[in-house]
């Protein structure tokens, strides 16, 4: 895991270096970002498809963790913060627990996490997509509900990851159109 963190740092440092006579690679990649977004979302969906059945079969709860209020936050003035917090929530709380539920899915969950980290890195590099500081109440509600579900929360959160991808897509589509 440490080597992947080092690799991410190298990618960031390489992307920030200015090219003679041109904008930075970061600026250039930001102009291409809207065109690359569908590919990044497809990669997330493909990675999720490898673990979707496992987690949805284990999710025995009837309630929904990722409610419509979260999508509304994604579409509202808190969209940036809600997206940032949800990415952090999945990377730091959900996926580390999900990796430990079955050795057969660990690699696939890790791959899904790496795809999500790549998206976060590109969003941060292109400040117009993720320039935020405020807290989202909907994200807090998701985190509280997740905590209350205890071990079952991992199954619930992972089984709804496709909803999260759809919310990311709705947020990014809105930002690109503005």
Swiss-Prot record:
Disulfide bonds join 30-126, 80-132. PROSITE patterns: INTERLEUKIN_10 (PS00520). Gene3D superfamilies: 1.20.1250.10. Keywords: Cytokine, Disulfide bond, Glycoprotein, Secreted, Signal. Its main location: secreted. GO terms for biological process: immune response; negative regulation of B cell proliferation; negative regulation of cytokine production involved in immune response; negative regulation of inflammatory response; negative regulation of interleukin-6 production; negative regulation of membrane protein ectodomain proteolysis; positive regulation of B cell apoptotic process; positive regulation of cytokine production. Residues 1-18 form the signal peptide. It is found in: Secreted. Pfam families: IL10 (PF00726). Glycans are attached at residue 134. GO terms for cellular component: extracellular space. Homodimer. Interacts with IL10RA and IL10RB. Major immune regulatory cytokine that acts on many cells of the immune system where it has profound anti-inflammatory functions, limiting excessive tissue disruption caused by inflammation. Mechanistically, IL10 binds to its heterotetrameric receptor comprising IL10RA and IL10RB leading to JAK1 and STAT2-mediated phosphorylation of STAT3. In turn, STAT3 translocates to the nucleus where it drives expression of anti-inflammatory mediators. Belongs to the IL-10 family. This is Interleukin-10. It comes from Papio hamadryas.
